[in-house]
From Swiss-Prot:
It is found in: Carboxysome. It comes from the Bacteria. The keyword Chaperone does not apply. Keywords: Bacterial microcompartment, Calvin cycle, Carbon dioxide fixation, Carboxysome, Photorespiration, Photosynthesis. The keyword Isomerase does not apply. This is Ribulose bisphosphate carboxylase small subunit. Heterohexadecamer of 8 large and 8 small subunits. RuBisCO catalyzes two reactions: the carboxylation of D-ribulose 1,5-bisphosphate, the primary event in carbon dioxide fixation, as well as the oxidative fragmentation of the pentose substrate in the photorespiration process. Both reactions occur simultaneously and in competition at the same active site. Although the small subunit is not catalytic it is essential for maximal activity. Belongs to the RuBisCO small chain family. GO terms for biological process: photorespiration; reductive pentose-phosphate cycle. The basic functional RuBisCO is composed of a large chain homodimer in a 'head-to-tail' conformation. In form I RuBisCO this homodimer is arranged in a barrel-like tetramer with the small subunits forming a tetrameric 'cap' on each end of the 'barrel'. GO terms for cellular component: carboxysome.
Length: 10
């Protein structure tokens, strides 16, 4: 399963 770069919210 490919891990997609998730949007980091600060």
């Amino acid at each position: 399963m490919q891990t997609l770069p998730k949007e980091r919210r600060y």
